[in-house]
Amino acid sequence: MKKIFLLLIVATSVLLAKVNVAVSYPYLAAIAKQIGKEYVHITVLGSAKYDPHFVVPKPSLLSRLNKADMLIINGSGLEIGWLPPLLKRANNGKINPGRVGFVDVSQVIDMIDKPTAVSRAFGDVHPEGNPHFNTDPHNIIPIAMLIEHKLEMVDPIHKTNYARNLKKFLNQWYIFLKKFDEKMKSCKDMKVVQYHELYNYFLKRYGIVSVGTIEPLPGIAPSSKHTIKLINTMKDEGVKVILQDPYHEKKTANFISKKTGARVIVLPHDVGAIKGTDTLESFYSIYAEQLCN
């Protein structure tokens, strides 16, 4: 009887134990929460308030990685400047690249902007392609499916729960996408300038034309010569919108706005990056609200 009682305790502990999931960025946490629900405990490594390329590798992140059963990253080199040293020091074999607990969501994305050559002369380029694919709401679908698949592998006991949560989430997301896509139709063929090539996936999805960038090259601060050239291009092309992210300096965009009459629109790069974008739906909705109204 004692052995049976102990076995019941162990079995109950296993059923109630949560999967510790570490994610590199908030949008991944928002998706994982929808799939994992009460069976996962999620910790976010990077803040939406800062440049995703440069997360400060604080010691507190080591303990989070050390305890993780699963690590979900954006991939495509976005975490290359800060995550590898932390992974090495965390010494957690469960979440190393190639293991079941390591999830690189870029692997299920049709990448764009792949450079034909990799050189510092071209700025801060990503060999695998543009890593900012989360700006396209349609990319949420394959990412959610991958996360669910990996959760099933890490925690097979709750396999049916994850599958059910995924189905419910996708049904809701398809409804959201239908409405969102309809709103975006009025923005087709709009011409914009962006600070960084942050919104390319979003722009490509909805037929919006990026005429240029405030950065002369990725990761390179704008020069006076490049800024004047961009102003002239915007006047020639009739560009009336400048897309500004929350973490780059805004002085240059405001200067260009005064010279061209274009309005500066600050769009979030991640869930929670600006006020009122704490959910996946609100994160994307603000794109349509700011651009197409």
Show which residues each predicted segment covers.
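Extracytoplasmic metal-acquisition and chelation regions
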Residues: A17-N293
